[in-house]
């Protein structure tokens, strides 16, 4: 079993810890929580670069090794890093429990060393008709991010 973790932070008080677990070549389980969010849906993605020198802006685009368009997690045509939305309750906390087969922790397309990002707005899953729908899901600003690192 391979485990990884990302500690999310921001200058706006949004913070959280996201855990990644993968058994063999199976799908990766993503669990954890993020606090300090406005209630509602927030885009949740793996971004290509594990670089936070300029905050979350330097994490690059969504992780997309197959050069596909943005989509929903269940879509065949999607970025590998498209994990859909997380929902923050009235308390501003989003509890995360996702399983995905396109974000391995080992091999040539591993997400280790990349970043996980929570966005300000809902991800329209590529179906919103906005000019950004097919690239970012029109999910708005990046409110928190963290680099995905191997865990003991």
Swiss-Prot record:
BP GO annotations: removal of superoxide radicals
Record's catalysed reaction(s): 2 superoxide + 2 H(+) = H2O2 + O2
Binding site for Cu cation: 45, 47, 62, 119
EC number: 1.15.1.1
InterPro entries in alphabetical order: SOD-like_Cu/Zn_dom_sf, SOD_Cu/Zn_/chaperone, SOD_Cu/Zn_BS, SOD_Cu_Zn_dom
Location(s) in or outside the cell: Cytoplasm
GO cellular component: cytoplasm
Name of this protein: Superoxide dismutase [Cu-Zn] 4AP
Organism name: Zea mays
């Amino acid at each position: 079993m391979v485990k990884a973790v990302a500690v999310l932070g921001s200058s706006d008080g949004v913070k959280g810890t996201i855990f990644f677990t993968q058994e063999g070549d199976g799908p990766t389980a993503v669990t954890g929580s993020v606090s300090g969010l406005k209630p509602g849906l927030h885009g949740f993605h793996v971004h290509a670069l594990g670089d936070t020198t300029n905050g979350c802006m330097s994490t690059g685009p969504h992780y997309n090794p197959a050069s596909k368009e943005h989509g929903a997690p269940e879509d065949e045509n999607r970025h590998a890093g498209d994990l859909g939305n997380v929902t923050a309750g009235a308390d501003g906390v989003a509890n995360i429990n996702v399983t995905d087969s396109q974000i391995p922790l080992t091999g040539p397309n591993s997400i280790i060393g990349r970043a996980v990002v929570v966005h300000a707005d809902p991800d329209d899953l590529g179906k919103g008709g906005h000019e950004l729908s097919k690239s970012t899901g029109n999910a708005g600003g990046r409110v928190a991010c963290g680099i995905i690192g191997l865990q003991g």
